[in-house]
UniProtKB/Swiss-Prot annotation:
SUPFAM superfamilies recorded: Pseudouridine synthase
Active site residues according to the UniProt entry: 55
Taxonomy of the source species: Archaea, Methanobacteriati, Methanobacteriota, Stenosarchaea group, Methanomicrobia
Keyword list, A-Z: Isomerase, tRNA processing
UniProt name for this protein: tRNA pseudouridine synthase A
Record-stated family: Belongs to the tRNA pseudouridine synthase TruA family.
């Protein structure tokens, strides 16, 4: 039987999601947990896959994974029983044998939690609206793919219990695309740039790209694969640190603390970095 799982993780202690020998990754932890309880031996033969890759330090609330196993009845309980406290399963569903979370994904939604306040939310939301539609995102990403053209379905900036949040939904993204968009919005929110900056970036009229915002504020919020998940029993170790009542305090502590330790100021720039001024 093929099963799909909705997964959450705190990305701080992972070297990204993709399997890498000698490093702790989300895929590595999941595969090891499955093999430990003999859900499968070979991840390739089991068709193990995730819906999307996340970089080092990026978190997830709604990542989707899938694999095939001859022991579906014990898969759900076994997974949460074997996983570490910073990685857990929120839901599961039986899916067709051909289901692949990456290729069957209809859309992926990210949220970026800003460690800066107050910000001009109205100006940021106005600028975010310019992202909607099909554009060349060369100036808002690090382009590795053949085409820099992507289509954004929705984009908005709002406050959630006092924390400024940028939410964007698209089918696929370029590398660092969301973090570069967040960095540009931050320049607008701090009044270092006008909302028209976003349109100038999309039209290619700016001389350089904005630097990518720190990874620690980024959350893979949801992946829509057209699957309805059955919620799992709450695991006592699981910490819905982005969705719980403690989220605000934890986001402030995690993100600001990490920025302070990394020498990045609260505008997401290295000390002395005037890259925001050089955009135009």
């Amino acid at each position: 039987m093929r099963l799909a799982f909705q997964l959450s993780y705190d990305g701080n202690q992972f070297r990204g999601s993709q399997l890498q020998p000698a490093y702790r990754t989300v895929e590595g932890e999941l595969i090891t947990a499955c093999q430990r309880v003999q859900l499968f031996d070979d991840p390739c033969k089991a068709g193990f896959a995730l819906a999307g890759r996340t970089d080092r330090g990026v978190h997830a609330r709604g990542q989707v994974g899938a694999f095939s196993t001859p022991f579906p009845e014990r898969a759900v309980e076994a997974l949460n029983g074997q996983l570490s406290p910073d990685l857990w399963c929120n839901g599961f569903a039986e899916v067709p044998p051909s289901f692949h979370p990456r290729f069957d994904a209809i859309s992926r939604t990210y949220r970026y939690f800003f460690a800066d306040w107050p910000l001009d939310i109205r100006a940021m939301d106005q600028a975010a609206a310019a992202l909607i539609g099909t554009h060349d995102f060369s100036r808002l990403a690090r382009v590795r793919e053949k085409s820099p053209i992507r289509t954004v379905k929705s984009a908005r900036v709002f406050q959630d219990r006092g924390i400024p949040v940028f939410e964007v939904t698209a089918h696929t993204y370029l590398w660092h695309m969301v973090r570069c968009m967040a960095a540009a919005l931050l320049l607008i929110g701090t009044h270092e740039r006008e909302p028209e900056l976003m349109e100038r970036l999309l039209s290619g009229k700016c001389r350089r790209n904005p630097p990518a915002a720190p990874a620690d504020g980024l959350v893979l919020w949801d992946v829509d694969c057209g699957v309805t998940f059955t919620p799992t029993e709450p695991d006592p170790r699981s910490r819905d640190w982005i969705g719980s009542a403690r989220r605000e305090a934890m986001v402030r502590e995690r993100i600001i603390g990490l920025l302070d330790r990394s020498g990045v100021d609260r505008r997401g720039k290295e000390p002395g970095d005037d890259s925001g001024r050089d955009l135009l």
